[in-house]
């Protein structure tokens, strides 16, 4: 039987996780579910979760360049993205760019995120996807689709999308891609995925078979790996 994991959440690094979690909770209408000194979890309206991990030496990304790359960003769905963007700015965001039906901003920790128009969303924003930068978006999409038991639902020149169990992850094709080299502070991670498995040994075997690398970190209930694009991720019980 093929071993697959279950996507638990995407976690963003920040120096001030209280400020960042409160920003997203207030902007999107989401709920803070777990709060510890080094970790906060926020739950979206449809039950997805986003983590905020304390990183005292966090270096903010500087989008759109690759000297301090974004690595990850969140795509949020809202009915009335222009009004939502003004509200985000009032809460501490910075406007970065405008698209035909979306606006790109940086949150208070510097992580870019997109507010995307979707009619009829209601007062609580939706989380469409966490989007991960890659030098080969299709290859990274297939890696995670196989690891998570999800389906590749789109592939194109700009990126790829996988979906399953009510969750989606996008992969953005990036020219001149500069990978994280965690735990090297000169090339820090900006975010990571937490993936639940039933058995750490079996999960590790599957991840390595698909092209991941084991990193020298972890504990009794989790292990840390790098995906083929260098992004760290955790397998957890």
Regions found by a protein language model. Name each.
Residues 2-56, 83-84, 90-98, 103-104, ...:
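Core segments of cupin and vicinal oxygen chelate
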Residues 7, 70-72, 186-191:
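Eukaryotic phosphotyrosine signaling hubs
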Residues 13, 75-77, 131-133, 194-196:
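Short hydrophobic/aromatic beta-strand micro-patches
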Residues 46, 107-109, 227-229:
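Residue-level recognition of short loop/turn positions
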Residues 58-63, 176-182:
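A short, acidic/glycine-rich surface segment
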Residues 79, 94, 111, 198, ...:
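Conserved Rossmann-like nucleotide-cofactor binding loop
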Residues 99-121:
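Short, structured interface segments
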Residues 117-132:
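Solvent-exposed, charged amphipathic helical/linker segments at domain boundaries
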